[in-house]
Amino acid sequence: ARPTLFNVVDCQDVRVEDVRLRNSAGWGLSFHQCCDMTLRGLDILNRAYWNNDGIDLTDCKRVLVEHCNVNSADDGICLKSYDPESGNDSITIRHCEIRSSASAIKFGSASWGGFRHIRISDIRVFDTFRSALAIESVDGAIVEDVVADGIVARNTGNPLFMRLGQRAGHRKGVLRNITIRNLTCDVPFGRPDEGYDLRGPETS
């Protein structure tokens, strides 16, 4: 398996601040089942391989991500859940700038547990191939009490993607109490990520 720059599992009171991270062989910062975390002032460039994410939060609770600059070949900041009895809860993402050859901020697609009490604000998105914000529940997750306020996207494929599905026959998930406010997006005629060395998959 390709190594990540940070792979933190089952930890609490985690603080990562003012760190410059460059071109992991895999995901950039990956946190699994952690709680009470602060990620602040990170400068992440992670484009060495086509599916390199910037920050991945998997089944984490009480997390603050702020004042980060993320430039990734895959999703910028991604919330995932592999544990049906857990999920991501009480996550705040604010004051960040993101470039991505996939989605800037994404829920899923791994979505067995839930995504609850998520706050996203003051996000600047540039040169992003897919979505400024993608919310997906395809493995049975309950996505609820989500507020995204103040996302400005330039040269981005689309502003918002939401998907509710039953991948591999799992129970259908739920999307409820989701608020999107003050979302502005400029969508280009051509590819928004044309300056990237590695791109997401082509569509036909």
Language-model features: locations:
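Extracellular/periplasmic carbohydrate-active domains that bind, remodel
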Residues: 1-204
